[in-house]
Amino acid sequence: MGFTAPSGWNIWKMRFEKQSEGESDMKYYSTRDAAVRMDAAEAIKMGLSRDGGLLTPTRIPQIDRAFLERLIPTEYAQRAAKVMALYLTDYSEEELLTFGRNAYGPAQFDDPIAAPVRKVEDGLYCLELWHGPTSAFKDMALQMLPQLLSAALRKTGEKRTACILAA
């Protein structure tokens, strides 16, 4: 039994590719034209492809249990940097860690963990995403985006000011 989309629904097929031996660079393609390819900095700078498509990674990195276990004792910014480094290969892990510490540090979040997981009762936990400057879950992304966008402009040689509007 499969899923059939109702008439009028626009469903995209994801075009994930197998990572070639020795390949480490992640590219992003447009959901409207797989021939449109770019690196992470260009994708972050653009937001959407020029053809109106979403920019999607060409592959999903494989994460094993050992990788996840190595994240357990680390601070939130380190976890964010390690995971983002799998997708943003044109940024160094050191850059991502700096961005993460700027985005999720005590100047921005009122909890030193940024996104703590609290036990509610046996077998039930709550991920608290309201400790940021606006007390909304979107702070998790919107504190990091300006750092990534500013770096993307530098990496692509653009000298302009970017404005991020969020609702």
Where do the language-model regions lie?
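N-terminal amphipathic/basic-hydrophobic helices that include classical n-h-c signal peptides
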Residues: 1-24
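PLP-dependent amino-acid enzyme catalytic core
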Residues: 12, 22-167
